[in-house]
Structures are given as structure tokens and as C-alpha cells.
Swiss-Prot record:
This is Zinc finger CCCH domain-containing protein 3. Residues 25-108, 121-219, 265-296, 336-493, 798-891, 913-948 are annotated as: Disordered. Pfam families: zf-CCCH. Residues 157-166 have a biased composition (Basic and acidic residues). It comes from the Eukaryota. Residues 56-74, 441-452 have a biased composition (Basic residues). A zinc finger (C3H1-type) spans 667-695, 699-722, 723-749, 750-777, 778-800. Residues 128-141, 372-398, 847-856, 864-885 have a biased composition (Low complexity). GO terms for cellular component: mRNA cleavage and polyadenylation specificity factor complex; nucleus. It comes from Homo sapiens (Human). Interacts with SMAD1, SMAD3, SMAD4, CPSF2 and CPSF3. The keyword Repeat applies. The gene is ZC3H3.
């Protein structure tokens, strides 16, 4: 409630002040009063205050032939250039005077004005009438400085009926001051009130003497658009300004020229400067009819309360009731927002916003005619950043080009259909101001300066084509005739030329096309979607255009093929196999195709290749159709040529892979042929990829036994005995091998060790160092009579058909091959039974030892390898005498044990015992005595055997 009461009071004060000012200074020159006699800035509590003086010299001193020379001289910068310093100092003097308690020097035709924003979101605009009591010298000096400062003629810029005038004045951030007096009754005051649920209304209040000293903030709005002419009977609330308040920092540069600009009316009073508190507020004209029209003007204000980077189009048009439009995007809208914001209140040097005393008399837009209803477009931005000052300097272009060509590219898509007259009145749209021509805002944190030499083709479209606008949620596009998409935007990237942005691709244009006329740019998209081009939509969205369409396009016939043909060739060469029947219409049957293309041949680099499913074979012939060869060389526009290249590439890769594999197969692997090593021959012969080394062939077992009859070198096995090729001696594993020249390897291996796979192949390179069993017999089959691997087992499976015959009739351990093989195989079986029989072998008799060795099935299951037979036969002679001695020795040591053992074994092995027994009983004691130590010595090797 408190805020509402304050708002009402401010509205009353503003309205009364305006009415009093009009009654006092209607059509006469403003009466001169001391500048600081009655008005000081209001209380500065928490906001910012901007106070400025606006020198208003009479028009009669201006020349009428200077043109737009002010553009080269003045700009909106952080610190004004040299020529603008005197007015800037004048603008700050009143505040310094108010702060120091000294009245500022009165100047003739100087309006002092203050625009503030209270806490209740109300805009308060104070206007101090010009003083007459100034000294002649001061006014003369001021007049001279102003005439020197303002060189632009105003005779051709006087507003006609229904037109405004370019704003003039300066706005500079002032230091925080506290008012020590009250405003005089003559001070006009404009209050923009925002009531809940209603648009903001600007009213004038007369007396401000009792206005409360609330903290006020200076309005630094983004846009102000003012309509100069209205019907005398209508008070349209839709026309006026939008004094949008931004909650954070306010972009002052965008609104300063309009917010604090003045209007002069030449209806019979050309000498009298008529002040205006705000261009958007009710103007105080000097003419009677316009006074009647504009005295009761109600201006609709709209506040943008978004805290994001949201931008709106704010329009003041008598034809459209809409006052705001949403912008296309924050990035594009930011291009039209001046980044020079108000500085902190405690800083001395702040960004100064100069609405030039001689504002920029731009040419009106091409679509606006004299007498047409003027419309203004402004970007209204609300930025959440509360930056105190801006370090960027807005500098106008020094060139005399048309500044409309330096607008942002999105202005070409700006809504201009219902408001065609963009800049006909004096209040130019903000898009035409100099700050936007020099810089382009890419994001919130980065400002990129555009090159002054760039002339964007879409920039001239804001006034040329008043096409209907379509306002959508995501974009603001112009609807052009016969155009389905938005017009392409040409971006300027440094050192890379223009890049054409369309929906799906970025195309870099050559530097020669950096400066395109408007017609060429408008026809740029028409060429891209020419009716003569084919558009083939597939799953991958591939667009194929015939080369005749881009090559015959009239706007740029020379530079087009450089980038267009490249893109066409790229799009064709991507998915040629899928597109070929569609794009070329059965390209093999084309009338211009050579004969060899339809027969599965392809010409690659002038050489014919026959293309099959997986092979590309080169032919000796040359293509007879010579006319097609240049077409194939420039195959970027020839889908068949590109297809042949693609097929050739795949076929070549496949053929190379085949050759590589064949070469790898031919190479000799670093492995020995298992067939050659085991059997001495290989059926593949020289085609075998493995190594055939005669030194690694297995030893002939018959040669070891001395029974090989092929001693002339025809034996496929090796007659060179080496222990690397021989299996492990089974007697050595038992600990009973007494042959000093045993050809078998004497190596201790674990009982649990697996069979060496290399030895199975015929040769183990590790030899005696191998920790695996070097055997050719299957231990599982030898132990249990069955192998779990079955036919896949690589070891020998010897049957036990000779076991019963050997157990019944075998006279000695070694004469029969089956016995020898069984003993070799017994070395690979479990050795516990043999260990348990050692005491019986030492103490009772040799008959018990041999009986246990022969009768135990784990020791002698099945047969053994053929090499072991020779070993058994060779060791039989040496081992025949120790069993006999042991047999004679046993009864003398323990006859009872011998009798019990013999009684137990006689039934099992009667023939064996009878063979070992001596015929003469008297010879037994004689033989036993000398053989007793031998028995102890012969038993010692049994303890050497490891128990792993």
C-alpha cells in the first residue's frame, strides 16, 4: 500500500508539473530562471541518477548543406571524444553545483532534465526550463561552442506533420547527490506508473515541491519508441513508449538518445526550442494543434521483468496494437543492445552516453515515404547481469557507407510487414544506431567486432521487403514468396570468407563473393532450391542436384562451380550404390555410356578393369570410347565414374587381402612337421608349410634293437641316436637301469607330469631340460585299459593281448619284445607297487622281485613303444646275473621268509621260480657268501629314485 500511495503521489506531481509548465511556457520561449534556484536532484538513496543538460541553440544558426558528416565525428563511447567534451562538462556541472551548494552557471537555451526510476518501478522525468538570466558572454560562448560542436544542418531535419525528430541531448552518469532543496513549481515531472494488471501509464504532474525524497534509480532502458502524430480525438493506449525496466544493470546506450532526446516543431516557431521530458512521454510542442493532440497523450509502457536474456520487439505504431514482440534469439537480440551500461555510483569516470546534440540524420528506410505513418522498432533487452560499467567502446564506422548495411543479419528477418516505415521519423530505430553497426554481440560474455568492409546482403532487407512475418515460438521469420525456408544468413568468419548457413550445411564461399548485392543474396537460396534440380529424399536425406542448375545460374556463374560442384560431388560419392539406380535412372543404359561400362568393366586412370563380385582384374585393352575418358577424369559430376572408383577400391583391397593370405600360407612357419618328424616322410612334400628337418626325425627303433634291415639309407627313420629324440628310460625311472650305454634318456620327471606335446610331434627342442614326459604311450590306456579321449588321443594305445602269454611263459625279463615294451610303459604308470616290492627284492629272493614286477598289472599293462624293445633286449644280458645271485642269496638270510614267500608265489609263477632255482643245492652256500655285499650294493640305486 505504501508503494501505491507513493506512485499515486508521483503521478499527481508529474501531471501537475507538466500542466503548469504548459500554462507558463505554452508557445512562448521558456522563461529564464536561475538554474539552481528551485531544482536540485532528488534524494539519492539506493539507485542511480542521471542528470544532464541539453544545450538547445536556436535553429537559425545552422547551415543546411552539411549532410551526414556527424556520423564520422560522433559516436557513443565510454568517454566522449574531444569535440563533445564541452557539452559533456556542461551536463555534469549542475550536479556538481548542487552537491557543492553553489548554483550552476545559467546557460541560455539549456534544458536540464533528470530521469529517475523509483523503487516502485516508476519512471520520473524532470525537466528544468531554460534560464534567461544567464550572462550574455556565457550564452555566447555556449552558442559558439555548440555551433562548432553541431555541424549538421537541421533545416532538412525538421519534422513534418506526423513525424518526430531525431533525439538530441546528452546523458551522462552522475555522481550520487542528495537534494538540499525542493523543486520549483515550474519544473515539469513525468511519472510512469506501473499498476498491477494494467499497462504502465505515463502522466505529467505539475507541482513537485512536496515530492517525497524517496530513493530513485535512473532509468537506463533498452528502448524507447515514440509516435509523433496521433488523431486529435483518439488517445490510443497502444501508442507510446515502453519504458521497460530492467532489474539488473540497464543498458543505457540503447535508450539514451530516445529517452532524453527533444522534439522541436516547426509550425511557426522555428526559433523556440521546445523541451520534452521524454520522447516516449507526453511531448510539449510549441504549436497549438499539436499541443492539443499531445497534451493528453497517454503512453503505454511495458516492463520486461524477465531475468534471462529475453528480448522483445517494442513498437510504437498507430496501426498495430501490439507493443512488444519476442525476439528471435538472445544472441541475435543482443546484437542490438548496447553493452555500455551505467557505471557504479561511486566511480568518477563512468561510461558516458551521448545522444549527440546533433543527432544522426539518417536516411529513412527505403520503404518509408514522406507522410506515411512512422513506426519505430527497438530491441528491448533484459539482461540479468548487474555490471557496473562496461569496458567496451562503441565506435561508429568512419566510412560513409549506408549504415543499414551494417545491421545484424537477423534484422533482415525482423518483423516489418505491419510496420513498414522503420526510420522515417526523427526517432530512428535503435537498429540503425551506430553502436550496432560496429559490434556484433555473439554471447553474453563476448563482443566481436565486425569488419567494416563487410556488406551483408541481408542487411538491406529490413526496409525493402515488407513481407508478412510469422511469429513462432522458436524463430521470427519472414515469409517470402516461393520460399519454404528462412533465407540463408551469411556469416562473416575471420579470414575464411562468408559461410552460408542453411538448415543442414555450411558452405564456404570464395572471397570474391564476400560483397554480394541484395538481389544476388536474395536469389542465393532460389538457386539452391531451383525447380530444375532433382531432390531425392532417401533414408539418409541425400540431395542430388543436376549440374545444369548451378552452372547456369545467372547471379554468379563464375564463382559457383568452385564450391557448389565440390559439394555435389561429395553428396554423390557418399552413397553411390544406393542412389545409382535412382539418380542415373539405370545408369548403365545411358546413351552416352561406353560399351565396356555395361559389360562389367571399369576404367580407372585410363586402364580397363574387369569388376567381379570380389575381384578386380586388370585387362590389357584400352577403352575404345575416347570421349568418355575426360568425363571419367572429371568424375566428380559422373556418378558412374565415382561408382567405378568405389568398386575398384573395394576390389583392390580384397585382392590385396587374398594375396597377403596366400603369401602367409606359403611362408615356412617356425614349426616342425609332426608327420615328418615321427614317420620320416610327409605326404604334402614341398607344399608343406612346416619345417622338414632330417636331424629331427625319430630314431629307428629297429636300428636301436639291431633288427633294422634297411641299412642302405632307405629307412625313413633316423639311424642317428640322440637322447633328445629318445623316450625316457623306464628302467631308469624304476631305478634299476644298469646299462651304462643306455640310448634312452635318463631324466627324472614327476609322476604327475603330462606328456610332452612337442615330443609327440617327433622332436622336443628342450631335450633333457623338458619337465614333461617324453613318451609315446598313453598312460591312461596303459593304466586302465581305456582312454577318455578316445580316437582323438595322439598317444599309442597298445592292447594287452600278449600279457597273459608273457605272464605265463616269459622266461626272462628281457627276451621278449612285449615284456620290454611293458616295462617301458610301466615307467609311466604309478610307481608305488614297485616301491613296495623293493624290500622283497632285497631280502627274500629275486623270484619274489620278478614275480611282483611281472604279476603287478599296473607295471606292465599293454605294450610299450617300439624303441623300448631294443633297450629291454640290451639290458637283459646285464640284468640276468644279478637276479640269479639274489636268488641264491635269499635263503641264507631268511629261509623262513623265503619258504613262506615261495609257498605263496609258487602257485602263481611256477615256471619263473623253476628257471631261477639252481639244480645243485650244495652250490647255494658257496655262491651266497661272496654275493652278500653285492646284494647290499645292488640295492643302493633304489634309494636314488626321487619320490615326487
Amino acid at each position: 500500500m505504501e508503494e501505491k500511495e507513493i506512485l499515486r503521489r508521483q503521478i499527481r506531481l508529474l501531471q501537475g508539473l507538466i500542466d503548469d509548465y504548459k500554462t507558463l511556457h505554452g508557445n512562448a520561449p521558456a522563461p529564464g530562471t536561475p538554474a539552481a534556484s528551485g531544482w536540485q536532484p532528488p534524494t539519492y538513496h539506493s539507485g542511480r541518477a542521471f542528470s544532464a543538460r541539453y544545450p538547445r541553440p536556436s535553429r537559425r544558426g545552422y547551415s543546411s548543406h552539411h549532410g551526414p558528416s556527424w556520423r564520422k565525428k560522433y559516436s557513443l563511447v565510454n568517454r566522449p571524444p574531444g569535440p563533445s567534451d564541452p557539452p559533456a562538462d556542461h551536463a555534469v556541472r549542475p550536479l556538481h553545483g548542487a552537491r557543492g551548494g553553489q548554483p550552476p552557471v545559467p546557460q541560455q537555451h539549456v534544458l536540464e532534465r533528470q530521469v529517475q526510476l523509483s523503487q516502485g518501478q516508476n519512471v520520473v522525468i524532470k525537466v528544468k526550463p531554460p534560464s534567461k538570466s544567464g550572462s550574455a558572454s556565457a550564452s555566447g560562448a555556449q552558442r559558439g561552442s555548440l555551433e562548432e560542436f553541431e555541424e549538421t544542418p537541421w533545416s532538412d531535419q525538421r519534422p513534418r506533420e506526423g513525424e518526430g525528430e531525431p533525439p538530441r541531448g546528452q546523458l551522462q552518469p552522475s555522481r550520487p547527490t542528495r537534494a538540499r532543496g525542493t523543486c520549483s513549481v515550474e519544473d515539469p515531472l513525468l511519472v510512469c506508473q506501473k499498476e498491477p494488471g494494467k499497462p504502465r501509464m505515463v502522466k505529467s504532474v505539475g507541482s513537485v515541491g512536496d515530492s517525497p525524497r524517496e530513493p530513485r534509480r535512473t532509468v537506463s532502458e533498452s528502448v524507447i519508441a515514440v509516435k509523433a502524430s496521433f488523431p486529435s480525438s483518439a488517445l490510443p493506449p497502444r501508442t507510446g513508449v515502453a519504458l521497460g525496466r530492467k532489474l539488473g544493470s540497464h543498458s543505457v546506450a540503447s535508450c539514451a538518445p530516445q529517452l532524453l532526446g527533444d522534439r522541436r516543431v516547426d509550425a511557426g516557431h522555428t526559433d523556440q526550442p521546445v523541451p520534452s521530458g521524454s520522447v516516449g512521454g507526453p511531448a510539449r510542442p510549441a504549436s497549438g494543434p499539436r499541443q492539443a493532440r499531445e497534451a493528453s497523450l497517454v503512453v503505454t509502457c511495458r516492463t520486461n521483468k524477465f531475468r534471462k536474456n529475453n528480448y522483445k520487439w517494442v513498437a510504437a505504431s498507430s496501426k498495430s496494437p501490439r507493443v512488444a514482440r519476442r525476439a528471435l534469439s538472445p544472441r541475435v537480440a543482443a546484437e542490438n543492445v548496447c553493452k555500455a551500461s551505467a557505471g557504479m555510483a561511486n566511480k568518477v569516470e563512468k561510461p558516458q552516453l551521448i545522444a549527440d546534440p546533433e543527432p544522426k540524420p539518417r536516411k529513412p528506410a527505403t520503404s518509408s515515404k514522406p507522410g506515411s505513418a512512422p513506426s519505430k522498432y527497438k530491441w528491448k533487452a533484459s539482461s540479468p547481469s548487474a555490471s557496473s560499467s562496461s569496458s567496451f567502446r562503441w565506435q561508429s564506422e568512419a566510412s560513409s557507407k549506408d549504415h543499414a548495411s551494417q545491421l545484424s543479419p537477423v534484422l533482415s528477418r525482423s518483423p516489418s510487414g505491419d510496420r513498414p516505415a522503420v526510420g522515417h521519423s526523427g526517432l530512428k530505430p535503435l537498429s540503425g544506431e551506430t553502436p550496432l553497426s560496429a559490434y556484433k554481440v555473439k554471447s553474453r560474455t563476448k563482443i566481436i567486432r565486425r569488419r567494416s568492409s563487410t556488406s551483408l546482403p541481408g542487411d538491406k532487407k529490413s526496409g525493402t521487403s515488407p513481407a508478412a512475418t510469422a511469429k513462432s515460438h522458436l524463430s521470427l521469420r519472414r515469409r517470402q514468396a516461393l520460399r519454404g525456408k528462412s533465407s540463408p544468413v551469411l556469416k562473416k568468419t575471420p579470414n575464411k570468407g562468408l559461410v552460408q548457413v542453411t538448415t543442414h550445411r555450411l558452405c564456404r564461399l570464395p572471397p570474391s563473393r564476400a560483397h554480394l548485392p541484395t538481389k544476388e543474396a536474395s536469389s542465393l537460396h532460389a538457386v539452391r532450391t531451383a525447380p530444375t534440380s532433382k531432390v531425392i529424399k532417401t533414408r539418409y536425406r541425400i540431395v542430388k542436384k543436376t549440374p545444369a542448375s548451378p552452372l547456369s545460374a545467372p547471379p554468379f556463374p563464375l564463382s559457383l562451380p568452385s564450391w557448389r560442384a565440390r559439394r555435389l560431388s561429395l553428396s554423390r560419392s557418399l552413397v553411390l550404390n544406393r542412389l545409382r539406380p535412382v539418380a542415373s535412372g539405370g545408369g548403365k543404359a545411358q546413351p552416352g555410356s561406353p560399351w565396356w561400362r555395361s559389360k562389367g568393366y571399369r576404367c580407372i586412370g585410363g586402364v580397363l578393369y574387369k569388376v567381379s563380385a570380389n575381384k578386380l582384374s586388370k585387362t590389357s585393352g584400352q577403352p575404345s570410347d575416347a570421349g568418355s575418358r575426360p568425363l571419367l577424369r572429371t568424375g566428380r559430376l559422373d556418378p558412374a565414374g565415382s561408382c567405378s572408383r568405389s568398386l575398384a577400391s573395394r576390389a583392390v583391397q580384397r585382392s590385396l587381402a587374398i594375396i597377403r593370405q596366400a603369401r602367409q600360407r606359403r611362408e615356412k612357419r617356425k614349426e616342425y612337421c609332426m608327420y615328418y618328424n615321427r614317420f620320416g616322410r610327409c605326404n604334402r612334400g614341398e607344399r608343406c608349410p612346416y619345417i622338414h628337418d632330417p636331424e629331427k626325425v625319430a630314431v629307428c627303433t629297429r636300428f636301436v634293437r639291431g633288427t633294422c634291415k634297411k641299412t642302405d639309407g632307405t629307412c625313413p627313420f633316423s639311424h642317428h641316436v640322440s637322447k633328445e629324440k629318445m623316450p625316457v628310460c623306464s628302467y631308469f625311472l624304476k631305478g634299476i637301469c644298469s646299462n651304462s650305454n643306455c640310448p634312452y634318456s635318463h631324466v627324472y620327471v614327476s609322476r604327475k607330469a603330462e606328456v610332452c606335446s612337442d615330443f609327440l610331434k617327433g622332436y622336443c627342442p628342450l631335450g633333457a631340460k623338458c619337465k614333461k614326459k617324453h613318451t609315446l604311450l598313453c598312460p591312461d590306456f596303459a593304466r586302465r585299459g581305456a582312454c577318455p579321449r578316445g580316437a582323438q588321443c595322439q598317444l599309442l594305445h597298445r592292447t594287452q593281448k600278449r600279457h597273459s602269454r608273457r605272464a605265463a611263459t616269459s622266461p626272462a625279463p628281457g627276451p621278449s619284445d612285449a615284456t620290454a615294451r611293458s616295462r617301458v610303459s610301466a615307467s609311466h604308470g604309478p610307481r608305488k607297487p614297485s616301491a613296495s616290492q623293493r624290500p622283497t627284492r632285497q631280502t627274500p629272493s629275486s623270484a619274489a622281485l620278478t614275480a611282483a614286477a611281472v604279476a603287478a598289472p599296473p607295471h606292465c599293462p599293454g605294450g610299450s613303444a617300439s624303441p623300448s624293445s631294443s633297450k629291454a633286449s640290451s639290458s637283459s644280458s646285464s640284468s640276468s646275473s644279478p637276479p640269479a645271485s639274489l636268488d641264491h642269496e635269499a635263503p641264507s638270510l631268511q629261509e623262513a621268509a623265503l619258504a613262506a614267500a615261495c609257498s605263496n608265489r609258487l602257485c602263481k609263477l611256477p615256471s619263473f621260480i623253476s628257471l631261477q632255482s639252481s639244480p645243485s643245492p650244495g652250490a647255494q652256500p658257496r655262491v651266497r657268501a661272496p654275493r652278500a655285499p653285492l646284494t647290499k650294493d645292488s640295492g643302493k640305486p633304489l634309494h636314488i629314485k626321487p619320490r615326487l
